[in-house]
UniProtKB/Swiss-Prot annotation:
Organism: Leifsonia xyli subsp. xyli (strain CTCB07)
Cofactor needs: Mg(2+)
Originating gene: leuA
Similarity section: Belongs to the alpha-IPM synthase/homocitrate synthase family. LeuA type 2 subfamily.
Protein name (Swiss-Prot/TrEMBL): 2-isopropylmalate synthase
Biological process (GO), any one: L-leucine biosynthetic process
Stored HAMAP family: LeuA_type2
Enzyme nomenclature, EC number: 2.3.3.13
Enzyme class: transferase
Length: 590
């Protein structure tokens, strides 16, 4: 078949290939023949490199939540800030130290430029810390030297060495703190290799690495400029040319400008690196830092312990989304909502047969399925190992069916359902159509939706919609986030007032329900108005766990808070109805 592609009109004359900018020549490379057998040392830089790239940088509270998450997951080296750059970062580092929040086996890392007042301020922030890495950096690339610093190589070396000497000089400002050093030739990928090795080796002479006090040399792809194999070649070349190599921890810091940061990190690790810096789910400037979740779970899929706990990936994702105020993509490797979902009928059939084959083999060998080597088509990992269920994997409805239902609800009724609620409701529609057959119109879909999620108006139904019905509501004694809530609530045939407390209206409402023996836990919440007018009605959606059932509820009201209460009641009533009909928890609402 003839290739009919044609030249584009794009201005390719503006760009030069990487090999014409920086020479990386390693014909005797050895890394392609190597295999990864053990996890690298990890350093999470979410609190600095990730935080600086956020539209809304983390508050101290969100920073602490992120730090605690990283500690629980098992990260032992955590970059916590640039204390000389802002009072916020300085205060956060101090709070971690003064509140004894840093476990004995965790080392914090702080960033500084090579300036005297910044380095002194950095050491001031570390007073009282048991152990810390001082991360010194200055930019070394050809472009930065010419455009930003207007300096020759020696001028850049002088900056690095002056900074390194000041670091050693100011160690006395943090007595009792074990100080370790990291040096980064920033914009390393745009730096000539021989110059990168020279400036790193001169910095090493100042830092004086020993077996007990190794020095980290960090080689950042500050901007990803070439294919991952080129980065790996440069890492192997540097590993061969660094002095005191046995006392150097060679570290990688890939960015994702070309979309290949994970591959660059994995190949760079094969090429001789010992350590990798990155962020959870790849947050960071521009297209982000390398994704530590992808790197870690990739190791796990190969039977290599990542030495990091990813067993509750949804909690990790929700926490990161809260701290970063940015969503994790639905197809983000291992953590996205859709990564284990098959819409293709042939894929679903293969997955189903894979599960059946695993079960049959376990029975033949008289072992538990979890004791077998995982082997299911289209699923490179058991979703349960990341805390996921099989519910989304084995559902029968097609993508078009789900999309069509969601489109009609949005276009005809202005309801913009969250994706996971779309999936749940498409199962409800499928169950109805399987039982009754025939074409499903927009009006019929709306009727099914009302019957499942919304209380029918008294004029349209004589039947009780559910156990609970909301009356009036009021909040009082608001002190910061603390709320005391009073509601009028119908519980069966009884109408009474009830009071609850919590760190917000929904938490206070959960307190009221808990007092009635209903155990409710929130997973997800969203809301929107049904029109653009000032008096618009609001729709609220909640995903909750009600006494072991994970399901959605929907509430519609002129008041957004009341809409959220109604959504919770919707979910609770659905759970009660499912219990009464003995529907299994994972099929509640279907």
């Amino acid at each position: 078949m003839k290739n009919t592609q044609a030249p584009s009109a794009m201005p390719i004359h503006k760009y030069r290939p990487f090999h014409e900018q920086i020479a990386v020549d390693l014909p005797d490379r050895t890394w392609p023949a190597k295999r990864i057998a053990v996890a690298p040392r990890w350093c999470a830089v979410d609190l600095r490199d990730g935080n600086q790239a956020l539209i809304d940088p983390m508050s101290p509270e969100r920073k602490r939540i992120m730090f605690d998450l990283l500690v629980r997951m098992g990260y032992k080296e955590i970059e916590v800030g640039f204390p000389s750059a802002s009072q916020t970062d300085f205060d956060f580092v101090r709070s971690l130290i003064e509140e004894n929040a840093i476990p004995d086996d965790v080392t914090i890392q702080v960033l500084t430029q090579a300036r005297e007042h910044l380095i002194k301020r950095t050491y001031d922030s570390l007073v009282g810390a048991k152990r810390a890495i001082v991360h010194l950096y200055n930019s070394t690339s050809v472009l930065q030297r010419e455009v930003v610093f207007r300096s020759d190589r020696q001028g850049i070396v002088d900056i690095a060495l002056a900074g390194a000497r000041l670091c050693r000089q100011f160690e006395a400002l943090a007595p009792g703190t074990e100080i370790y050093y990291e040096y980064s030739p920033e914009s390393y990928t745009g730096t000539e290799l021989e110059f990168a090795a020279d400036i790193c080796n001169q910095a090493l002479e100042v830092f004086e690495p020993t077996p007990e006090r190794k020095v980290i040399i960090n080689l950042p792809a500050t901007v990803e400029m070439a294919t991952p194999n080129v980065y790996a070649d440069s890492i192997e070349w540097m590993s061969r040319h660094l002095n005191h190599r046995e006392n150097v921890i060679l570290s990688l810091h890939p960015h994702n400008d070309r979309g290949t940061a994970v591959a660059a990190a994995e190949l760079g690790y094969l090429a001789g690196a010992d350590r990798i810096e990155g962020c959870l789910f790849g947050n960071g400037e521009r297209t982000g830092n390398v994704d530590l979740v992808t790197l870690g779970v990739n190791l796990f899929t190969q039977g290599i312990d990542p030495q990091i706990d990813f067993s509750d990936i949804d909690h990790i994702k929700r926490t990161v989304e809260h701290c970063n105020q940015l969503p994790v993509g639905e197809r983000s490797p291992w953590g996205g909502d859709l990564v284990f979902t098959a819409f293709s009928g042939s894929h679903q059939d293969a997955i189903k047969k894979g599960f059946e084959a695993m079960a049959a083999r376990a029975q033949r060998e008289s072992v538990d399925v979890d004791d077998l080597v995982w082997a299911v088509p289209y699923l490179p990992i058991d979703p349960k190992d990341l805390g996921r269920s099989y519910e989304a994997v084995i559902r029968v409805n097609s993508q078009s069916g789900k999309g069509g239902v969601a489109y009609l609800l949005k276009s005809d009724h202005a309801l913009d359902l969250p994706r996971k609620l779309q999936i749940e409701f498409s199962g409800v529609v499928q169950a109805k159509t399987d039982a009754e057959g025939g074409e499903v119109t927009s009006n019929e879909i709306w009727a099914i939706f009302q019957d499942e999620y919304l209380p029918a108006p008294e004029t349209e139904s004589d039947a009780k919609w559910g156990r609970f019905e909301l009356g009036s509501t009021s909040t009082a004694n608001e002190n910061g986030d603390h709320v005391t809530l009073t509601v009028t609530l119908r519980d069966g045939e009884t109408v009474s007032k009830a009071t609850g407390e919590g760190n917000g209206p929904i938490a206070a409402f959960f307190d009221i329900l808990n007092a009635r023996g209903i155990n409710v836990h929130l997973y997800d919440y969203s809301q929107h108005t049904l029109s653009a007018s000032e008096s618009a009605t609001a729709a609220a959606y909640v995903e909750v766990n009600v006494d072991g059932r994970r399901l959605w509820g929907v509430g519609i009201d002129a008041d957004t808070t009341t809409a959220s209460f109604k959504a919770v009641i919707s979910a609770v009533n659905r759970s009660v109805r499912a219990s009464a009909s003995s529907v299994p928890a994972e099929l509640a609402g279907v």
